[in-house]
Amino acid sequence: MKSVLRICAALFCLAAAAYFLLPLTFGVFHIGMLYPAALFLLCAAALLFPAAVHRLFTGKLRKAAIAVTAALSAAVVCVLAVCLLIGLAANDPPADGEDVTVVVLGCQVIGERPSVMLQARINAAFAYLSAHPDAPCIATGGKGDNENISEAECIRRELVAMGIDKKRIYIENQSVNTAENMAFSAAIIEREGLPTTVAVVSDNFHQLRASIFAARCGLDARSVGCSSHWMLGPGYWTREVLALGAAFIRGY
């Protein structure tokens, strides 16, 4: 019975590793896919080869094996804790009647069309702007190497095509990362006299980091989050943990 349960657990770990690597079939590759997949593969190997694990923990490398296991366990706890904080930040919407500036964070543009993730952000922005017709909007994001137009321009075009008045939309098309998204948007807000409380439109995993950058620019961030594509989301959540760590180390 124990062997059956162990094999089932190993198969689950292998399936989880494959799931994190699935975006590779669509040309998506980043570190947030790799380290969870590697951890699940390591767990699968430990479950499938228990005798080897026993020798490792009772042989000459016993202390090293215990240290590595403890470090990995601590890392998993940290990742889960940060994911909890990310989830909490994603559940902080603007209050009813609160004056906000909607800031739509850019994402990949394919030619002149939004990617799946950017389209989800545009849809969320459209829903909020439609329900709050007095709210101004800043579309953010510069032009990447493989993009024919800036991410900000793509957002603006799509929102206008969906029925949002173009006069409500300001363009910030110079930023190349989230920190610049917020810093350059803050400059527009100050110049135009817009509300300094911002409703950040982005994937849920992105909200905590965006709110940190917003606060450092003197803005008070609220969340208008959208769910990520089922195949892409988990890897981006785990990548976001590393991005938050990098931002902390760099002092952003």
Describe each model-derived feature in a short phrase:
Residues 233-252:
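A transmembrane-helix-recognition feature enriched in membrane-embedded lipid enzymes
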Residues 5-53:
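Membrane-embedded alpha-helical segments of integral membrane proteins
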Residues 7-15, 67-77:
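Hydrophobic alpha-helical membrane-embedded or membrane-associated segments
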Residues 16-20, 47, 76-79, 83, ...:
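Helical transmembrane-bundle signal
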Residues 40-73:
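Cytosolic-side transmembrane helix boundary signature
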